[in-house]
Regions:
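Acidic, low-complexity Ser/Thr/Gly/Pro-rich repeat segments typical of extracellular/periplasmic
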Residues: 2-31, 36-282, 309
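Soluble periplasmic/extracytoplasmic beta-strand elements of cell-envelope proteins
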Residues: 93, 109-111, 121, 155, ...
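Sec-exported extracytoplasmic/periplasmic mature domains
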Residues: 117, 153, 159, 206-210, ...
């Protein structure tokens, strides 16, 4: 192996070093001095690096006790305080939550605390139609003037100001409960009507009700007469209410419908919330005797008038039982084909017709029959006929009885050769005993 010989006159040539070698301090050996180990060199290097890092961190972070940059914390806190100081005290609440898909059609409204509402705008999202409403006199609330539609998307913007004039705004977009997921009960009689003593409260629901107890318990019917009123279910979609005996003449009946949010069955919820009142008029109960072909009208318990009639023929007798007038028509068409008598009659202008059953029993004027049949023989297909004129003019028994009758008056048929009318065929639940009626209640 080649050896390099050095001397003062012949210095050693410079040796090339690797980058790693350049980083290492030259090792010198001092005679008599302890030899440094590789571990010591590494320790010194790490210590030096740590010190440099500490200096760098100190330079970046600064002295915590010195003034200067605070990472923006004090500035942000000041901005937050200013924003809080400028925020309105008016807090707006919208009853229908933003994004809701099953909002009530009745309870939509706006309330504010710490201020007053200045304006509220509710629109149907698809059509842009504005829903009219009104802010309360004290400015604390707003309600729409009409019931909202089912299954409709709405947008609401409400603005208010506090006592210092600072504004607040609240927005909400929501969709009302769909018709597929809700139920409605069509009811009779209507609010404000005056009806006869036999008029029940009758609900017909547009969906099958399986949760009958909850639905019935959220409909309260009461009378100023103090009579006990009980509900009775006919199947799963009809619920009627009546007292044990006919309503007291002159009394006021009130029904409170609180079905909004009530579960009627799987996947269906009620949406109605309202109070309805109607008045019971004078008492009028008319009794038709098929043996004599006469009808006796009693007004407030006293005989008022007797009228000759022509009831059902022997082939088509009239139902027996208590029947309630449910509809009145100055003139109507009666077509036999609609009730199983196809081709036997089709009279387009029957005068003074009043419905007694949903299957087609009426008490009505008759201008086509001979005057001799009234009070003597039954000639109809099951209706009760009264002498009348074509067009309904003149002074006739048919016209008189029509004018003297109310929806809800009772017509009792007796001594007919037919069966008693079914209690759910029309508004004829009076044909059930009180015990049987109460047995049909779900409450």
């Amino acid at each position: 192996m080649e050896q390099l010989v050095t001397s003062p006159d012949n210095p050693a040539p410079a040796r090339s070093r690797t980058p790693h070698q350049l980083l290492q301090p030259a090792e010198q050996t001092v005679p008599g001095a302890p030899r440094r180990t590789r571990r010591m060199r590494r320790t010194l290097a790490v210590t030096a690096l740590f010190a440099a890092g500490a200096l760098a961190l100190t330079a970046c972070g600064g002295d915590a006790s010195a003034g200067g940059n605070d990472d923006g914390k004090n500035g942000q806190a000041g901005a937050d305080a200013a924003a809080k100081k400028d925020a309105s005290d008016a807090k707006i609440q919208v009853s229908s939550k933003d994004g809701a898909t099953d909002a009530s059609i009745n309870d939509t409204g706006v309330k504010v605390t710490g201020g007053k509402l200045t304006d509220v705008k509710l629109t149907a999202a698809d059509s842009g139609a504005v829903i009219a409403g009104a802010i309360s006199a004290d400015g604390s609330s707003w309600k729409p003037g009409v019931q909202l539609e089912r299954g409709t998307k709405y947008k609401l913007v409400a603005n208010a100001k506090d006592a210092k004039g600072r504004s607040a705004t609240e927005n909400a977009t929501f969709t009302t409960v769909s018709s597929a997921n809700s139920f409605i009960g069509s009811y009779t009689p209507d609010d404000g009507k005056t009806v006869g003593v036999g008029m029940p409260v009758s609900f017909n629901f547009d969906k099958v009700i399986s949760n009958k107890k909850d639905v019935q318990s959220h409909i309260k019917v009461s009378s100023s007469s103090g009579q006990e009123v009980v509900g009775h279910w006919f199947g799963s979609q009809r619920l009627d209410f009546r007292p044990e005996d006919y309503w007291k003449a002159g009394s006021k009946v009130t029904m409170k419908i609180d079905l909004d949010g009530v579960k009627g069955g799987a996947g269906i919820t009620g949406v109605q919330s309202k109070t309805v009142s109607f008045t019971i008029g004078r008492s009028q109960v008319s009794t038709v005797d098929m043996n004599t072909q006469q009808m006796t009208i009693k007004r407030d318990g006293k005989t008022y008038k007797t009228i000759p009639i022509s009831g059902g023929s022997p082939q088509h007798p009239t139902y027996n039982g208590q029947m309630v007038i449910s509809e009145k028509f100055e003139q109507t068409r009666m077509d036999g084909s609609t009730v199983g008598f196809g081709g036997e009659y089709d009279i387009k202008d029957v005068p003074h017709a009043m419905r007694l059953s949903s299957s087609g029993t009426f008490i009505h004027g008759n201008y086509w029959g001979s005057s001799s049949v009234f009070g003597n023989s039954g000639t109809s297909h099951g209706c009760v006929g009264l002498r009348d004129n074509k067009g309904g003019g003149g002074d006739t028994p048919g016209k008189w009885f029509f004018n003297e009758s109310l929806v809800g008056d009772v017509v009792i048929v007796k001594n007919s050769h037919d069966k008693t009318v079914q209690p759910d065929n029309g508004l004829n639940g009076w044909n059930l005993s009180w015990s049987d009626w109460k047995a049909g209640s779900a409450v």
